[in-house]
């Protein structure tokens, strides 16, 4: 049975189910190409701004229609572990596919936006729209991109999908709206009378119309309150240069330096989400790679807490030489092993760190340095991360300065569950407002 005349009809029907979002701080994000005509109708009905999230499926080389994952803007990568195992793909084969698709992703992003800035998502509801869901790899990547860009809430809205769509997107979308979930679902096109391909030119035309006709009604100006500084930077940390991203808003109240966990980088989706929230609250942020690519190849370096802490100390010293950050009080936000490094660095007399926040951290890796931490410290742990919770409880008993342990109910180690990372960001923001902006710790 055909449920929709075409993508426009599907979008109008979908908009009716999303009517409760009217008047809220919404950005509608279409997945090109087929999702954009649907998203246009949703944005038009909600009088919300329309943008695209460009993602590319990663197809198995000998069976391209079977996706083993997807990539999105800003380095987001999602893998389907079952497909990878079942097809016996190795890293070299996957990397070759990803390199090719990355070129196409960049081309499309430039073509579709035509020089316009990405619409900011910080503090907004991101409504991600496609013409339907098949494997879901593309939409999952899109959800992660939206969250990385600071969306307060991620809603996935599609006209048609499998009957287990809600379960599939647990941990990716906060809410899933799907008009039809046929018991015998085999393809997105089965719900449409007209399912002809959408061209690049049509995508551009829809975005142009939305920008002209109703973007202003959404009251979101991409150029409003631009950061004073928002750029990739090269930092000399000891004997090596490391890559970072520095964001400084107007009249910053302090700066938070992020220390990522093992196997991560300055592109960490979760850290970038927290950083966007902090920037929105008036804090400058620096996300940087604790190790060079060459150093990362030696796995021992990843867990060399003294080395990682020395990088934090060096970077903190570098910030003191930058005109935009020299006078700002400094805080650390550490995740996993990065939290251990942050606590070691905070205990070092060469730096004046005013506050520390740990997300799913390993403070036990800080060893004897815990006994010298006087900066107010917030330890955030998931309620279902039992082993790490016990490690943090022991660390709290050792840290002599103010130390608070907060448990996020229902969260596992990575805070992937809907709403849990948002709680982390709010807790961190409140902690830095209370402790980074006031007088420093005594001792």
Swiss-Prot record:
Induction: A member of the dormancy regulon. Induced in response to reduced oxygen tension (hypoxia), low levels of nitric oxide (NO) and carbon monoxide (CO). It is hoped that this regulon will give insight into the latent, or dormant phase of infection. GO terms for cellular component: cytosol; peptidoglycan-based cell wall. It comes from the Bacteria. GO terms for molecular function: hydrolase activity; transferase activity. Pfam families: DLH (PF01738), Pribosyltran (PF00156). InterPro entries: AB_hydrolase_fold (IPR029058), Dienelactn_hydro (IPR002925), Hydrolase/PRTase-associated (IPR052036), PRibTrfase_dom (IPR000836), PRTase-like (IPR029057). CDD domains: PRTases_typeI (cd06223). In the N-terminal section; belongs to the purine/pyrimidine phosphoribosyltransferase family. In the C-terminal section; belongs to the dienelactone hydrolase family. PANTHER family: ESTERASE, PUTATIVE (AFU_ORTHOLOGUE AFUA_1G05850)-RELATED. This is Putative phosphoribosyl transferase Rv0571c. It comes from Mycobacterium tuberculosis (strain ATCC 25618 / H37Rv). The lineage of its organism: Bacteria, Bacillati, Actinomycetota, Actinomycetes, Mycobacteriales.
